[in-house]
UniProtKB/Swiss-Prot annotation:
BP terms from Gene Ontology: glycine decarboxylation via glycine cleavage system
Catalytic activity from the UniProt record: N(6)-[(R)-lipoyl]-L-lysyl-[glycine-cleavage complex H protein] + glycine + H(+) = N(6)-[(R)-S(8)-aminomethyldihydrolipoyl]-L-lysyl-[glycine-cleavage complex H protein] + CO2
Protein name: Probable glycine dehydrogenase (decarboxylating) subunit 2
Subunit and interaction comment: The glycine cleavage system is composed of four proteins: P, T, L and H. In this organism, the P 'protein' is a heterodimer of two subunits.
Pfam families assigned to the protein according to its UniProt record, in alphabetical order: GcvP2_C (PF21478)
Taxonomic source organism: Thermus thermophilus (strain ATCC 27634 / DSM 579 / HB8)
Its EC number(s): 1.4.4.2
Gene that produces this protein: gcvPB
Cofactor(s) required, per the database record: pyridoxal 5'-phosphate
Length: 474
């Protein structure tokens, strides 16, 4: 049965609320140049229709609150509802308020920054970036400003990335004006040290690494990598996508990283299943601190204030002060668990991943890079099975599928990240489902799912010719 869009439910003249008092005309409140030329085409529905519509939509969704969501490299952990209550309390703040009237909010941001610096081993931090990729770009722009300030901006034009890197890494470097060169992985799934040595030199601006990497493996030679980068004058950039594995146990700053971006919407339980809002703070070592974007939240004798007086700053990277309510949720998470709780969360994330990996191996799946897994691992189905078909089959069995076809160096990759918040019984049920799929007829897998609201989408067409609004005829 098809589910009508809210615009298809619209009937002219229907309304959910009737205003009993005259409302001022928009042109009396808003400058003419900021007014729309034509009124917005909003749906006209009564309140009951509206409630049923969105309640119906909620029942057609899959999320962490409804099922196991092992999306690799996304850390789809449970988001405590207490954090939603905390965020709600700040809803009436306005970014144009005098900072003297928002001391509590500024204190929260300052404290969160201190917590994140302590967890990462960084000396200074900005909370401005609104997402992980936004944080990446901010970090690379800081590195670019640093090299330019030293007179090396014209010579250091290359950024190195591993072949297992997130796609946003090379995209970020390219957006910042750099050439990108790929470093291959060695036979154990870690950075090929000899290949890295051949690429390092006075032409390189930075090396971007994720540790643990996207195969779920810790880069055991990270101190050697860091030493080589330092000798070559290369800045070492930490993609914080996988910090959940080492949170409280190891710090990027102690490994030699100069810049780190974090994903509060992953590691620190800010909801992100619907695409945001996210938060990607960027921490730096002291030599890069002058280039951080403005403003920074600082603590002075008379309280907390916003520091715009930073002459070497790369400038603003976002309006106002970051996605503030995401910061509230992350602050609440850290305050709730404390350091010992964060360490336990990381340990459980690793334990769950290792247990689930062994369960899937027993069911017939292969793990091509089978070292000591951290928070996630990459599996392969037996010959003759496609990762895409297995992912669609999982939807039919009531589970969200893992990430498929990434990292690119693993054929038919199934990237699984169970997170720390899942119970042993859930992992076992998922493994049973994965095993059951291998016993399904090929035709069943190729046509799954069967009972979802939408079956197989034309994903290529959706990417190349998106219809972004109801009124878009494209």
């Amino acid at each position: 049965m098809s589910f009508p869009l809210i615009f298809e439910r619209s009937r002219k003249g229907r309304r959910g609320l009737k205003l009993v008092k005259a409302v001022p005309k928009a042109e009396d409140l808003i400058p003419k140049e900021h007014l729309r030329e034509v009124p917005p085409r909003l749906p006209e529905v009564d309140e009951l229709t509206l409630v049923r519509h969105y309640t119906g939509l909620s029942r057609r969704q899959v999320g962490v609150d409804t099922t196991f969501y092992p999306l690799g490299s996304c850390t789809m952990k449970y988001n405590p509802k207490l954090h939603e209550e905390a965020a709600r309390l700040f809803a009436d703040l306005h970014p144009y308020q005098d900072p003297r009237t928002a001391q509590g909010a500024l204190r929260l941001m300052w404290e969160l920054g201190e917590y994140l610096k302590a967890l990462t081993g960084m000396d200074a931090i900005t909370l401005e970036p609104a997402a992980g990729a936004h944080g990446e770009l901010t970090g690379i722009l800081i590195i670019r400003a640093y090299h330019e300030d030293r007179g090396e901006g014209r010579t250091r034009r290359v950024v190195l990335v591993p072949d297992s890197a997130h796609g946003s890494n090379p995209a970020t470097a390219s957006m910042a004006g750099y050439q990108v060169r790929e470093i291959p992985s060695g036979p154990e799934g870690e950075v090929d040290l000899e290949a890295l040595k051949r690429e390092l030199g006075p032409h390189v601006a930075a090396l971007m690494l994720t540790n643990p990497n996207t195969l779920g493996l810790f880069e055991r030679r990270i101190l050697e990598i860091s030493r080589l980068c330092k000798e070559a004058g290369v800045q070492l950039y930490y993609d914080g996508a996988n910090l959940n594995a080492i949170m409280g146990w190891a710090r990027p700053g102690d490994m030699g990283f100069d810049v780190v971006h974090l994903n509060l919407h992953k590691t620190f339980t800010v909801p992100h299943g619907g695409g945001g809002p996210g938060s990607g703070p960027v921490g730096v070592k002291a030599h890069l601190a002058p280039y951080l974007p403005v403003p920074l939240v600082e603590r002075g004798e008379e309280g907390f204030y916003l520091d715009f007086d930073r002459p070497k700053s790369i400038g603003r990277v976002r309006s106002f002060y970051g996605n503030f309510l995401a910061l509230v949720r992350a602050w609440a998470y850290i305050r709730t668990l404390g350091l010992e709780g964060l360490k336990k969360a990381a340990a459980l994330a690793v334990l769950n991943a290792r247990y689930l990996k062994e369960l899937l191996k027993e069911k017939g799946y292969r793990v091509p890079y089978d070292g000591p897994s951290m928070h996630e691992f990459v599996a392969q189905p037996p010959e003759g099975f496609r990762a895409l078909d297995l992912a669609k089959g999982l939807l039919e069995l009531g589970f969200h599928p893992p990430t498929v076809y990434f990292p690119l160096i693993v054929k038919e990759a199934l990237m699984v990240e169970p997170t720390e918040t899942e119970a042993k019984e859930t992992l076992e049920a998922f493994a049973e489902a994965m095993g059951a799929l291998l016993k399904k007829p090929k035709e069943w897998l190729e046509n799954a799912p069967y009972s979802t609201p939408v079956r197989r989408l034309d994903e290529l067409r959706a990417n190349k010719h998106p219809k972004l609004t109801y009124f878009d005829e494209g």
